[in-house]
């Protein structure tokens, strides 16, 4: 019977349910979109093989570090593809070796990666000669695209420039800008073998039996493309970032959906009261409300999943276009997409039903004699579950914040930790919103309008809370996360400036090149009257230091950012507390104090290609949030090219310094590099990092804030639409339409003020804890807030709320 009543109610009052249906559909679409993109990133994307599209079997070294413990075998993806061991190459004589290394025609435009290969591997793509002949001597090359046969050119390599002659061309393909050498010259330029290719199944089986190798066939051959490991690193980072963004978006969607459904039940209190009066039992009333919520939940969730299917590819395209993922990243719908959609669908229905459970139970327990009184004035009490849940979230958030600030300050810059703290505090404030609103709106209690505002809040705490929740979420998340990001970013940039603080100039590679050649570095060191240090950005795999508060991963090594230096000169400025950087060598390392290592201790680490090393600690550094906590000799950077050379002029005469600068510029110009003042370089790096952070924040907060804005409009419209009788009484009492609209606008602004005040308190806690943590970890760091953006978000929230509140009143209060 109550199912029939529920269906009839939906059919006859569909307009009243439109707001909740819209909020639910859009909320589920946000969850579906994020989960679909997250699933695609976690799956590694879908890419066809390029470099080895015509190779039957591709043999590579295992690109993962494997460890065995009582729980089984765990793997960690390596940061660089290791070479095929020489012993394996010797045991597979029938396979053809492929080498991929940096080789770029001087003056070639930046674009796809410039890579050199031996000519015998050209057929694996396949590349076929379109003119000329294959390289026959070490000074001959074949290039892709149009070129003048017989033309002498310069090829830039990691070892330095080479004078060669173009003797042939091949048709270009996507994925790289190839330069083909003789096999012997390729082996000289890059001794390591990146992959072996064979068409013999027996050879492939022997390779599989050797251990430590993987044999790739079919679509899996894309894992052997030269940029596959880097793509995997980018996708792993994207997966982590999307996980945070998905958690924030899901939190916002669930909170707004729950608020909208709770408001819809509160506004139908009169209907439910009448049902109790005519004899409906408490169980029947509660069942009817749950059934309505389930029906709306199913319809809204289905629509939301459909919208998610439409929006997920667009979001993936946006992510790829902003360089947050490989350029080829996309969402393709496969059987693996079903779980992501199922999660969104079930979440939507579950939230819809759960949102009305308390209201349905309260409506069902109302005695018939109290029903009509309950219909007029909402009860002011807050349910025990909501009270304890809100207090629990606040206690957990404050406790976590205190632990980070006082015990584990090095975790302050971690995005997962910051997001967890913010969500706990904002979630606690959302649950306690009905309790917080009245004291926060007391400043508006004067005058007739103020009396009406406070009376509206006091008699309708549920309605007021529903209006406050989206604003609280929008402003609270925006201020806390934007402020935390900008403050931590400023601390990281300060650490980077300190690293090159003693340098006068910085030598940088030309745009589109992966780094500086060792030949150029050697020429810079040969210039008199200057000190120089070549810095290489790299990573090392290591176990997390001692105890970490909020990372409970399995005891497997994880990547840590590091720099490799070729020498410790006066140009390198690192805050050494103990020991000396002069002792850095092939078997030593410098670490910051967050590693809790003592001078002379031996650390077990893994190089980016998985090579295990034991390095002795020769220097302890003061902690910095620049992201670099390890410093090694350049020999342990796995052949990566230096990203910069820090240069400091000697203390001699001005004429000698000028001569040194002129020589530096001339040497750099010959290699296509740039020389910039250190101050200008640090500013440029800061601008670049700010731009990258901005793109990340757009993804992290953009969807959530956009949905929150829709939630503000939806709940404000629903709230005003449910007050037609109250507004009509005001008109009968003599209020004009303009006065009614003004009162509604003032009430909306008062609620916005309450939400902003609560958000300010939350943000103050978050940023205060962050400031303490940064001060303990890296010294004094000022709090940085994007005031203009925060003002725009708060102002837009207020404007949306005001407009959505007065529009229904203007059309329903009669003529003025």
Q: What is the meaning of each model-derived region?
A:
Residues 305-339, 402-417, 758-796, 802, ...:
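Short helix-loop junctions at transmembrane helix boundaries
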Residues 423, 435-593, 602:
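Juxtamembrane segments of multi-pass membrane proteins
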Residues 149-163, 599-615:
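Short conserved beta-strand and strand-loop elements enriched in small hydrophobics
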Residues 2-254, 263-266, 288, 503-504, ...:
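Membrane transport/envelope proteins' first extracytoplasmic loop
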Residues 15-19, 237-240, 253, 339-356, ...:
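Alpha-helical transmembrane segments, especially those used as permease/efflux helices
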Residues 5, 9, 13-16, 253-298, ...:
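Interfacial "coupling" helices/loops that link adjacent transmembrane helices in transporter permeases
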Residues 339-377, 790-816:
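C-terminal membrane-exit region of the final transmembrane helix in multipass inner-membrane proteins
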Residues 4-7, 11-12, 16-17, 21, ...:
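Alpha-helical transmembrane segments
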């Amino acid at each position: 019977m109550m199912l029939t009543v529920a269906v009839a109610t939906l059919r006859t009052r569909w307009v009243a349910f439109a707001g909740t249906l819209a909020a639910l559909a859009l909320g589920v679409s946000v969850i579906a979109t994020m989960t679909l993109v997250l699933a695609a990133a976690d799956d590694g994307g879908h890419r066809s093989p390029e470099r080895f599209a015509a190779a039957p079997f591709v043999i590579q070294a295992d690109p993962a570090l494997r460890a065995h413990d009582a729980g089984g075998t765990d793997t960690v993806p390596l940061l660089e593809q290791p070479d095929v061991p020489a012993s394996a190459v010797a045991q597979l004589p029938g396979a053809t070796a492929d080498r991929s290394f940096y080789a770029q025609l001087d003056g070639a435009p930046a674009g796809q990666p410039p890579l050199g290969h031996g000519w015998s591997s050209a057929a694996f793509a396949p590349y076929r000669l379109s003119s000329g002949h294959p390289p026959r001597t070490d000074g001959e090359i074949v290039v892709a695209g149009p070129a003048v046969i017989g033309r002498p050119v310069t090829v830039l390599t990691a070892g330095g420039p080479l004078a060669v002659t173009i003797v042939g061309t091949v048709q270009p393909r996507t994925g790289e800008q190839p330069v083909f050498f003789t096999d012997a010259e390729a082996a000289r330029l890059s001794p390591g073998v990146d992959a072996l290719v064979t068409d013999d199944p027996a050879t492939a089986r022997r390779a599989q039996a050797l251990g430590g190798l993987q044999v790739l066939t079919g679509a899996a051959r894309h894992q052997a493309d030269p940029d596959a490991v880097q793509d995997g690193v980018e996708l792993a980072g994207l997966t982590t970032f999307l996980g945070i963004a998905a958690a924030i978006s899901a939190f916002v969607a669930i909170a707004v959906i729950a608020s909208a459904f709770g408001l819809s039940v509160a506004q139908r209190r009169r209907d439910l009261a009448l049902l109790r009066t005519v004899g409906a039992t408490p169980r029947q009333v509660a069942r009817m409300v749950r059934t309505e919520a389930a029906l709306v939940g199913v319809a809204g969730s289905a629509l939301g999943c459909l919208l998610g299917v439409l929006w997920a590819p667009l979001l993936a395209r946006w992510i790829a276009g902003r360089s947050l993922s490989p350029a080829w990243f996309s969402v393709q719908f496969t059987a693996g997409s079903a779980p992501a959609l199922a999660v969104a669908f079930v979440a939507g229905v579950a939230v819809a039903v759960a949102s009305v459970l308390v209201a349905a139970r309260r409506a069902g327990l109302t005695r018939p004699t109290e029903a009509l009184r309950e219909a007029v004035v909402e009860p002011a009490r807050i349910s025990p579950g909501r009270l304890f849940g809100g207090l629990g979230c606040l206690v957990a958030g404050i406790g976590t914040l205190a632990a980070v600030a006082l015990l584990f300050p090095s975790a302050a810059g971690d995005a997962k930790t910051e997001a967890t703290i913010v969500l706990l505090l904002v979630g606690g404030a959302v649950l306690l919103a009905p309790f917080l609103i009245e004291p926060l709106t007391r400043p508006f209690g004067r005058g007739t309008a103020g009396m009406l505002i406070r009376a509206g809040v006091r008699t309708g705490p549920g309605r007021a809370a529903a209006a406050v929740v989206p604003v609280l979420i929008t402003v609270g998340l925006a201020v806390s996360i934007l402020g935390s990001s900008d403050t931590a970013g400023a601390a990281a940039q300060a650490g980077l400036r300190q690293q090159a603080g003693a340098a006068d100039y910085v030598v940088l590679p030309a745009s589109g090149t992966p780094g500086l050649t060792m030949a150029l570095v050697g020429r810079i060191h040969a210039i008199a009257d200057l000190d120089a240090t070549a810095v290489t950005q790299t990573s090392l795999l290591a176990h997390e230091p001692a105890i970490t508060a909020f990372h409970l991963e399995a005891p497997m090594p994880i990547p840590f950012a590091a720099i490799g230096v070729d020498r410790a000169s006066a140009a390198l400025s690192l805050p050494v507390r103990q020991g000396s950087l002069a002792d850095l060598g092939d078997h030593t390392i410098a670490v910051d104090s967050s590693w809790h290592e003592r001078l002379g201790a031996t650390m077990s680490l893994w190089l980016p290609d998985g090579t295990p090393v034991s390095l002795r600690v020769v220097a302890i550094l003061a902690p910095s949030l620049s992201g670099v906590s390890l410093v090694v000799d350049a020999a342990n950077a796995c052949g990566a090219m230096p990203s910069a050379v820090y240069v400091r002029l000697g203390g001699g005469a001005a004429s000698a310094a000028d001569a040194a600068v002129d020589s530096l510029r001339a040497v750099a110009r010959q290699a296509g590099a740039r020389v910039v003042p250190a101050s200008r370089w640090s500013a440029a790096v800061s601008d670049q990092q700010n731009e990258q952070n901005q793109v990340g924040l757009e993804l992290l907060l953009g969807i959530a804030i956009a949905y929150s804005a829709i939630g503000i409009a939806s709940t404000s419209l629903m709230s005003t639409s449910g007050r037609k009788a109250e507004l009509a009484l005001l008109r009968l009492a003599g209020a004009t339409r303009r006065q009614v609209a003004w009162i509604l606008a003032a009430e909306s602004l008062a609620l916005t003020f309450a939400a902003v005040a609560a958000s300010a308190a939350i943000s103050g806690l978050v940023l205060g804890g962050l400031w303490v943590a940064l001060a303990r970890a890296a010294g004094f760091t000022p709090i940085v807030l994007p005031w203009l953006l925060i003002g725009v978000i708060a102002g837009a929230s207020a404007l949306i709320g005001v407009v959505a509140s007065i529009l229904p009143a203007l059309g329903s209060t009669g003529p003025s």
